[in-house]
């Protein structure tokens, strides 16, 4: 009989949406002359953080059937803000015109390419020798 009274008087832990912290390490219940503290822990090495609220939320009586005022307000505001939103983005209607690849002579053909093509590669040696001569540093007398 005493265990049933203790279970009835046990206070509900705070829910996830409330503003209070969810750490319920020790819960003390007072029935007449006996005071009992029940640890909400699974193992001795457990940190006792949130185990009691996890057990009570998964039980039959508090399975989310009753909402706290904060949760009800949050749901109401979510409905208000998401009422005007469209569920999917409208598809843009555009046509893709496929371009034919045309050969542009001005892009790929240079004068040096044409000279190599018609005169052979021997003609380019003179330009190379001239460029190398321009790059050489001449010693100036001091």
Swiss-Prot record:
UniProt feature, compositional bias: Polar residues: 17-28, 39-50
Keywords: Developmental protein, Differentiation, Spermatogenesis
Keyword Cell wall biogenesis/degradation: no
GO biological process: spermatid development
Compositionally biased region (Low complexity): 29-38
Residue segments, region Disordered: 1-66
The protein's name in its UniProt record: Spermatogenesis-defective protein spe-17
Protein's gene: spe-17
